[in-house]
């Protein structure tokens, strides 16, 4: 049985930058979802007696255990493809899990951290918008629109000040013919207001009264240390340094975790989108989910990004504030307003309570229901942590042959300064 190479992750530890600049999120998504991250030149490549590949690189690779490497331009051509990093003996050497026993490399090619497998369907001339979709879509795969615009289409009725908090407006659509094709009431969207299909993409008002978007993916904001702190998007933010982040997933779903306040590296929030494992027939209702900071606060409204309902941040805080978006289960009327999903794991204390502290990996799946009383299914990849591993940054773990990473999340107000977090399952290392 071959080693799984579908789920990939990226981190700031790879040398990627997420700073206080407009465009940083889109550039990061381009790299992680579409292009991948090239490694430095390969000085030698060999196949050992077990059939694994050893790469010696000209400079530091900054790659992490269990990331996926894509090889191109090698001879014989059978060498080209995707491989899991099995070992990192030093900063310039990688060992890739392969099944190439008895083969030899005659020509060395190039290597990169493989992308998650998406493509850019549309981009705008000003380079502030993207529409992504998986490279091999089925009818269930949505178009993923990411918009960092600061003004309304007329450039006057809505203007967001560039020094305010940095976030993109993000949503899912069933079909698109151009980058701003989001006003058709007959096309499914998430989030969706049937009386105002463009609601997620609107910028209205100016100055401190501006409202920009609805489902927001933040990457730089004056953040909170506890439930009692509240800040506005217009509040001054730390403009120095690069944020910490992890982006993990595959062609079906991915999650983006980052610390919106650069001074608090472990206080990450989670956003994400894609398909979930539904208990319902997908011909009746699309199995989409979308997580972010769901709010329509003005730029000067004080709120806590993580803990304050009705503002919601995916799986953070509580059953009230930790909701995410799914399409409403109404097969007779699919073009209806979205509903909210709730994790079925009690307490929203993933990675905080030591319920099974003796287990190397205490990971369970994430079943969830919705506000209308329906059980909906399970989230892909992400797992509830039933112990506090005390990791300080993204950490690869292997349990028998199962590969995981663990990442911190500041997810429960009752826990004070105790960091929670999630496991993410990446498949089997065979």
Predicted regions, residues:
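Short, intrinsically disordered N-terminal pre-domain segments
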Residues: 1-40, 100, 394, 415-430
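Long, low-complexity regulatory tails in eukaryotic proteins
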Residues: 259-430
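Small/polar beta-strand repeat architecture
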Residues: 4-10, 16, 32-53, 76-249, ...
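Short coil-to-beta transition motif at edge beta-strands of beta-rich domains
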Residues: 56-76
């Amino acid at each position: 049985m071959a080693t799984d190479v579908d789920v990939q992750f990226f981190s700031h530890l790879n040398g990627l930058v997420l700073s206080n600049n407009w465009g940083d999120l889109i550039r990061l998504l381009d790299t992680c979802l579409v292009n991948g991250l090239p490694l430095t030149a390969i000085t030698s490549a060999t196949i050992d007696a077990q059939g694994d590949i050893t790469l010696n690189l000209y400079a530091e690779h900054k790659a992490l255990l269990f990331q996926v490497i894509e090889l191109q331009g090698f001879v014989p051509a059978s060498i080209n493809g995707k491989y899991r990093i099995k070992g990192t003996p030093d900063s310039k050497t990688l060992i890739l899990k392969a099944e190439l026993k008895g083969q030899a490399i005659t020509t060395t090619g190039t290597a990169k951290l493989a992308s998650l497998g998406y493509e850019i369907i549309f981009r705008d001339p000003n380079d502030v918008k993207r529409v992504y979709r998986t490279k091999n879509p089925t009818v269930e795969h949505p178009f993923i629109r990411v918009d960092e615009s600061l003004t309304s289409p007329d450039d006057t009725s809505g203007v967001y000040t560039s020094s305010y908090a940095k976030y993109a407006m993000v949503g899912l659509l069933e079909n698109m013919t151009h980058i701003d094709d989001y006003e058709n009431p007959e096309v499914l969207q998430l989030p969706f207001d049937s009386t105002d299909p463009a609601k997620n993409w609107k910028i209205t008002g100016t100055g401190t009264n501006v409202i920009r978007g609805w489902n927001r993916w933040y990457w730089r904001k004056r953040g909170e240390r506890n439930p009692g702190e509240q800040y506005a998007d217009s509040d001054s933010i730390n403009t120095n340094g690069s944020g910490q982040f992890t982006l993990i997933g595959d062609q079906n779903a991915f999650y983006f975790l980052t610390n919106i306040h650069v001074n608090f590296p472990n206080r990450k929030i989670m956003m994400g989108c894609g398909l979930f494992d539904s208990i319902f027939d997908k011909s009746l209702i699309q199995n989409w989910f979308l997580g972010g900071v769901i709010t329509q606060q003005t730029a000067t409204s004080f709120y806590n990004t993580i803990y304050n309902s009705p503002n919601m941040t995916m799986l953070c805080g509580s059953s009230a504030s930790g909701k995410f978006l799914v399409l409403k289960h109404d097969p007779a009327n699919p073009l209806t307003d979205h509903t909210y999903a709730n994790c079925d794991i009690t307490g929203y204390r993933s990675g905080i309570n030591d319920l099974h502290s003796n287990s190397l990996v205490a990971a369970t799946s994430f079943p969830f229901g919705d506000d209308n009383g329906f059980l909906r299914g399970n989230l892909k990849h992400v797992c509830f942590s039933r112990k506090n591993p005390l990791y300080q940054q993204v950490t690869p773990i292997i349990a028998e042959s199962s590969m995981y990473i663990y990442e911190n999340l500041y997810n429960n107000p009752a826990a004070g300064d105790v960091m929670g977090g999630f496991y993410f399952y990446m498949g089997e290392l065979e």
